[in-house]
Swiss-Prot record:
The active site is at residues 81, 174. Its main location: cytoplasm. This is Peptidase T. It catalyses: Release of the N-terminal residue from a tripeptide. Gene3D superfamilies: 3.30.70.360, Zn peptidases. One of its GO terms (biological process) is peptide catabolic process. GO terms for molecular function: metallopeptidase activity; tripeptide aminopeptidase activity; zinc ion binding.
């Protein structure tokens, strides 16, 4: 299994599938279809059926049940796109067998050191797949894709392992928050699902942020600075005044665990026009609403000083804490936990400081916790993944489907 997941990850990683948050199409980039077509053919080759790929880039497939028991239909999902944060063009994965715990020379100018990334010490003796230091790797989430396909292939080759009906989905645009926007839950037809989109060994996540995006626009009046007194209105100054109303401690670089934040993601401005882009995140729904109210109050304060038309604020909720929808069917988390424990994996059930496709899918009627895929240092040139962790993730999938079958009547 180890060599299969390595081969698949490296092959998938070389296909550029970066999404684009400025695009209004689905998928946001046509090149995501380059991998989707490869995966569609591969699913057919290994023996899955009912394979569909729609015009929006959603690839579904089925492994039919091989038991007479009434087992829930279980789905496994991963996304094909890579982040907009770092280039995914010309990815050249490097294989490092039997890692010795020392520095890793990614290229002649770049070293990945345990001094900077101490978690490397967890992987001594293992096979690591790294970047060449010029791109991301794309283990987020091509490791998840490799694990799901390898697990399905293993189940097909070992029919003595009993399971209910299984559904597979590979989806676009997760990295820009639009993965489930055109996901047809009814057509997918699963009772429960799991995303294989987590990080290190043992991650099992069923709580995510509540999330919103905020755009603030300020409008000023440009006048020659030599004659600007009582005439110029500076949009940049207004934008700064708004930002100064934001909490200084509730920011990503100062928070962890269940602590939420207001994050200024982007700023651009001139005298006449300035824009601020924020994301708001909190696991607690009440605190989430309070953060949005704080921003509305800051906007009202600036408007009172400069005029109502001088500032506009748009707040759009993006997704909610999936824990609210998973808690009533907590047994799906318990089964994943038991699957890990049977494989001597210690489950790590920390809240996701982010969101997955499962965050939205859970609110669309498909409860979907998140399981580790193995990636470390994702979204950058120091990204890597352990082949042994990918193999374990594949085994977790196989254990989960067996446990569902064993519990059924």
């Amino acid at each position: 299994m180890k060599e299969q997941v390595i081969e698949r990850l490296i092959r998938y990683a070389k296909i550029d599938t970066q999404s684009d948050f400025t695009s209004e199409t689905t998928p946001s980039t046509p090149k995501q279809f380059d991998l989707l077509h490869v995966l569609k053919d591969e699913l057919a080759t290994i023996g899955l059926t009912d394979i569909t790929l729609d015009e929006n880039g959603y690839l579904f497939a089925t492994l039919e049940a091989n038991t007479d028991k009434d087992v829930p239909t279980i789905g496994f999902l991963a996304h094909v796109d890579t982040t907009t944060d770092f280039t995914g063009t010309n990815v050249n994965p490097q294989r490092l067998d039997n890692y010795d715990g020392g520095d890793i020379q990614l290229n002649e100018n770049l070293v990945m050191s345990p001094a900077d990334f101490p978690e490397l010490q967890n992987y001594i003796g293992q096979t690591l797949i790294t970047t060449d230091g010029t791109t991301l790797l794309g283990a987020d989430d091509k490791a998840g894709i490799a694990e799901i396909i390898t697990a399905m292939e293993y189940l097909i080759q070992n029919p003595s392992i009993k399971h209910g009906k299984l559904r597979v989905a590979f989806t676009p645009d997760e990295e820009i928050g639009r993965g489930p926007h055109k996901f047809d839950v009814a057509a997918f037809g699963a009772d429960y699902a799991y995303t294989m989109d987590g990080g290190p060994l043992g991650e099992l996540q069923y709580e995510s942020f509540n999330a919103a995006g905020v755009k603030v626009i300020t409008k000023g009046t440009s006048v020659h600075p030599g004659s600007a007194k009582n005439k110029m209105v500076n949009a940049i100054t207004m934008a700064i005044a708004f930002q100064n109303e934001m909490p200084t401690e509730a920011v990503p670089e100062k928070t962890e665990g269940y602590e939420g934040f207001i994050h200024l993601m982007g700023f651009k401005g001139a005298i006449e026009h300035a824009e601020l882009s924020y994301i708001v995140r909190d696991h607690d729904r009440q605190k989430f609403e309070e953060k949005k109210q704080l921003m509305q109050a800051a906007a009202a304060k600036i408007q009172a000083q400069f005029g109502e038309d001088a500032l506009s604020i748009t707040i759009e909720d993006q997704y909610y804490n999936m824990g609210e929808k998973i808690e009533p069917v907590k047994e799906i988390v318990d089964i994943a936990r038991e699957a890990m424990e049977k494989l001597d994996i210690t489950p790590i059930t920390l809240p996701i400081r982010g969101g997955t496709d499962g965050s939205q899918l859970s609110y669309m009627g498909l409860p979907t916790p998140n399981i580790f895929a193995g990636g470390e240092n994702m979204h950058g040139k120091f990204e890597y993944v352990s082949a042994e962790t990918m193999e374990k993730a594949t085994q977790v999938i196989i254990e989960i489907v067996q446990l569902f079958e064993q519990r059924a009547k």
